Amino acid sequence: MSRDDFYASPFGVTYSAYAERPWLNRLIALTVWGGDTRRYYESMSAIREVADGGTIVDCPCGAGVALRELDPGENLRYVAVDLSPSMLRRARKRIDRRGLSRVELIRADATGIPLPDGSTDLFLSYWGLHCFPDPAAALVEAARILKPGGRLVGSTFVRGRDSLRQRLIRPDVGDFGKPGTAEDIPRWLEAAGFSEPQIRRSGPMLFFDAQLA
């Protein structure tokens, strides 16, 4: 199975189902990874801080979990990007259920998003960096399409030897691409042009919030 079809597997179906249920996702994360996902859902409030008429890019959008913060008729451009056709289909169903008319779905790689330079106010990058073959390049692409002072909010798994759970995060195994370490993420962010990123960690999960300088 190719990587872009990985989420068509039973794992992808299960992952999409529990990601939409914060209580269940938190229980699974605590049990399997020893981390707390509350910050993931809390950080989605950044969507409501974007000014009227602003643009949000959600890459990878997955099944569209972050759409929970959008209201029908809201005057925002929301661009949901993913490489997985199955995830985009699930996101479409979520869009239709919620009656969201201003969400655009795009199938694209995280290092080649078809939007102009400096066109985006908020970039969401949830649970994607550890899946990408070049996560540092994905952050450079996020910086490219963000406006000066634009905001990046996201989460990722980080590899390391701090715990047995972290040792399970191995490059090119399952849906992992080239996951970075806890030290790599702030370094990659700063190299891409983000200033003073706020980093929080829970087990092997790392949450980041940064502005483009």
Locate the predicted segments by residue.
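Class I SAM-dependent methyltransferase SAM/SAH-binding core
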Residues: 55-112
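A short glycine-rich, Lys/Arg-flanked "PGG" loop and its adjoining helix->strand segment in the class I
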Residues: 136-148
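Short N-terminal helix/helix-N-cap motif within the alpha/beta-hydrolase-1
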Residues: 86, 133-136
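Short glycine-centered segments of the SAM/dcSAM-binding site in methyltransferase folds
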Residues: 55, 150-151
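A short acidic, Gly/Pro-enriched loop at the edge of an enzyme's catalytic core
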Residues: 111-122
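C-terminal alpha-helical "lid/dimerization" subdomain adjacent to the S-adenosyl-L-methionine
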Residues: 9, 25-29, 153-209
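Conserved class I S-adenosyl-L-methionine
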Residues: 1-51, 65, 69, 169
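A short SAM/SAH-binding and catalytic strip from SAM-dependent methyltransferases
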Residues: 122-134
